[in-house]
Amino acid sequence: MNPAPNLVMIGPMGAGKSSIGRRIAKHFSLHFADTDHAIVERAGTNISAIFKYSGEPEFRRLEREVLHDLLNHENQLIATGGGTILDPENRRCMQERGFVVFLKINVNTQLERLAHDRYRPLLQQIDRKQVLSDLYATRQPLYQQIADMIVTTDHMSPNTATAQLILDLTAHWQKSSNAA
């Protein structure tokens, strides 16, 4: 058993961090928090507008602030944005205050799941596959570096992935307080 006060879901966009995370949070009686939603609430505008008018550095600053605020609490499942792991301080904090679950997905499955998504700023490019491939190459090693558990969600329905994660988490994670 690996005790931690929070569960933290990491992985690329489209992996299921939010949809599966909500189900896992309910099963384990955890508060569900999504960093992207918390950023929108804090900024008072959507993520696309933050990127457009303030730039990615401002978005990443807000992301770091929100993540650290969330991780100061306990009994939560935190679904992070795909790029949250780019900041070394975010990685350190997630490892210290959470049991980190990497939801892994391949680029082709991402393309299928995100085919109709027009809201993610990093996908507003002509060649989405190249963008996702580049993000995968940069971020994959960082996801693996901090993961306590890796679950591949390719070819899994949300129900199947949730059931598998519940089994895996029951075997490997113990909810604790003051684990940091």
From Swiss-Prot:
Monomer. Coiled coil: none annotated. The keyword Amino-acid biosynthesis applies. One of its GO terms (biological process) is amino acid biosynthetic process. Mg(2+) binds at S18. Substrate binds at D36, R60, G82, R139. Its EC number is 2.7.1.71. It is an enzyme of class 2 (transferase). Its cofactor is Mg(2+). ATP binds at G14, A15, G16, K17, S18, S19, R120. Pathway: Metabolic intermediate biosynthesis; chorismate biosynthesis; chorismate from D-erythrose 4-phosphate and phosphoenolpyruvate: step 5/7. This is Shikimate kinase. Keywords: Amino-acid biosynthesis, Aromatic amino acid biosynthesis, ATP-binding, Cytoplasm, Kinase, Magnesium, Metal-binding, Nucleotide-binding, Transferase. Belongs to the shikimate kinase family. Binds 1 Mg(2+) ion per subunit. It comes from the Bacteria. It is found in: Cytoplasm. GO terms for molecular function: ATP binding; magnesium ion binding; shikimate kinase activity. GO terms for cellular component: cytosol. It catalyses: shikimate + ATP = 3-phosphoshikimate + ADP + H(+).
